[in-house]
Amino acid sequence: MPLSDAMPALLVLADGTAYRGWSFGATGTTIGEVVFNTGMTGYQEVLTDPSYRGQIVVFTYPELGNTGVNPEDEESARPQVRGAIARNICHKPSNWRSTQSLPDYLKQHHIPGIFGIDTRALTRKIRMYGAMNGGISTEILDEAELLEQVQAAPNMAGLNLVREVTTSTVYEWSDPTTAVWEFNPDGTVKNGESLTVVALDFGVKRNILRRLASYGCRVIVVPADTSPEEILKYNPDGIFLSNGPGDPSAVTEGITTAKALLESEKPIFGICMGHQILGHALGAETFKLKFGHRGLNQPAGLTQRVEITSQNHSFAIDPDSLPEAVVEISHLNLNDRTVAGLRHKSLPIFSVQYHPEASPGPHDADYLFAQFVHQMRTTKQATTAEVS
């Protein structure tokens, strides 16, 4: 599309900074927290990841939409972002899997975007001053008028956005990672009886469910406000706490449930929001990072093993608040030394701040799914032996 045919658009940040560009996707006005993602690939997975609910995403890679979109790469049923910001947009994608252009896809789902702005300068600003609310509009092109709406919007801290993305009904997930994309999980973990995992849905990504299914798990997904009693009625071999959006300290229903589930002594595995929820259940606190971690190359580790990980989060666990007698740090983010993993000292319970399913991203941490399966099998065998 020639720029002469593009509709003008305006981006205004909460501090009054304004950027003028052109519209792609839907027209209208949208307001959310402006954050940046440094990944070179996986824009469709980012746009449809429920963890981005309430946010406007700046893509730092200068080209966006070159490979179009397709139904298989969606992490949920629709885009979850409030808006998208890009340097350049491709209106005519070229890829054998593409079924639709990115602008048409966002227009279909009523998601506004702006392109043609200096995304490098915008990213540096967020990095220096922190993530902040912003607004994109094709209707309001007066900076002061749009700024007024942006400043009236609530901040991310204190928001429970899980209620907007969790499932409303219980369902069972059985689809594994598609064979053409399978990257050889440890086949030994599939041997034996199928394991039942109840996944508490705070905004779960489909590829996490696929990895659990690939490792031989029967996955039952339940709403975030499901009581511990209802969860335990399924007699699960393990419990999974999923990723999700917003402030973890505001998800009081999840924290209360996780705290009760700890008493069951069943294996528990948490990812991202689930990691933070578990931290709260164990007595820790979380805090908001200046601009968060969003990208595909975050190093994490503690000993001599380092994993390159995919991350997407605004909050982190305060290490000084962890009860040292109960839990230990298993991983640190090696860029800023924030907590990236927890492990219970006596129970089969662990969590990571990053995404081991890595869709997109490196597969360094896929072993964590095998570790979860191993803990479930070991616990099940020990329980069976005690009964017999």
Swiss-Prot record:
The active-site annotation reads C272 (nucleophile), H355, E357
Give the binding site residues for L-glutamine.
Answer: S51, G244, G246, M273, Q276, N312, F315
Q: List every stretch annotated CPSase.
A: 1-192
The lineage's top-level taxon is: Bacteria
**Coiled-coil residue spans:** none
Family affiliation: Belongs to the CarA family.
**The protein's name:** Carbamoyl phosphate synthase small chain
Name the gene that codes for it.
Answer: carA
